[in-house]
Amino acid sequence: MSSRSIVFMGTPEFACPTLQALIDRGERLLAVVTQPDRPKGRGHKLMPPPVKELALAHDIPVLQPHRVRASAFVESIRQLAPELIVVVAFGQILPKALLDIPPLGCVNVHASLLPRYRGAAPLNWCIINGETETGVTTMLMDTGLDTGPMLLKRSTPIDENEDIVSLHDRMASLGAELLAETLDGLREGRIEPQPQNDSLSCYAPLLKKEHGLIDWQRPARQIHNQVRGLAAWPGAQTLLNGHALKLFRTRVADGAGAPGTVLCSTGGQLEVACLDGSLLIQELQLAGKKRLDSASFLAGCPIAEGTLLGGAATERPIP
């Protein structure tokens, strides 16, 4: 099977399995384009994106433009003359001048069943909204936000207790598999691009810290979904005696009481009332402390039954 000349564009860990799949297939990777190194941690040390580290480990040239719309960058890609550009969670909108360069087009791997959940955080919002199924779509890119013609789709169920960390890893692998299948299908002429139905679309906007603020005046299931969907970042949080308390793992229960009230804090269990039902908090973290299971947390930080969690600062609904 003849290889294609490809420029790969991606940034986070999610994109790494797809890049690795291209390497393993023997595709001719002319360059990898990724976001600039960013300061991280308390020391604000510049850290390379995961995709950059993988590319350098395989001696693939790396480009890190601050703006992909810059004419100098577009010209550098034109000089490489790729047959195809593959994009996975790159992080910038590509201009038409760049999209027009490869004769075979630009193929994007998007982590949703398009046209639903276009945008920056599809997996998180799928979970937050209580979806029971999601998937991956490959598409030919146009100048819109995830609006191009679809190539292939692969669906997968979401368990009611699965969080974003688990789903992210599964979908990253699924995306790599689907991209390989897509490239084979395009090479063999087996794929007919399908237009998206815009009337069925919805958007998954970039996450903000305020999306993590818990409003206990909501049903337990909705708060549970919020915890699952934000477990990686920013974390769902409330207040305990004025201190930020992040929740990482919960289960829905059928307790009743005033929303935000601690119903049970004995036997290693921490149960909090919601508008409809209650939550069993199984893993949590107080500001400045370690992330712990509920039994370990309560052993070091007892919470009296009847304690009210939250307050004016946290009682804001998720948009």
Swiss-Prot record:
InterPro entries from the UniProt entry: Fmt (IPR005794), Formyl_trans_C (IPR005793), Formyl_trans_C_sf (IPR037022), Formyl_transf_N (IPR002376), Formyl_transf_N_sf (IPR036477), Formyl_transferase-like_C_sf (IPR011034), Met-tRNA-FMT_C (IPR044135), Met-tRNA-FMT_N (IPR041711)
A molecular-function term among this protein's GO annotations: methionyl-tRNA formyltransferase activity
Enzyme class (EC, first level): transferase
Catalytic activity of the protein: L-methionyl-tRNA(fMet) + (6R)-10-formyltetrahydrofolate = N-formyl-L-methionyl-tRNA(fMet) + (6S)-5,6,7,8-tetrahydrofolate + H(+)
Keyword Protein biosynthesis: yes
Role according to the record: Attaches a formyl group to the free amino group of methionyl-tRNA(fMet). The formyl group appears to play a dual role in the initiator identity of N-formylmethionyl-tRNA by promoting its recognition by IF2 and preventing the misappropriation of this tRNA by the elongation apparatus.
The protein, known as: Methionyl-tRNA formyltransferase
Originating organism: Pelobacter propionicus (strain DSM 2379 / NBRC 103807 / OttBd1)
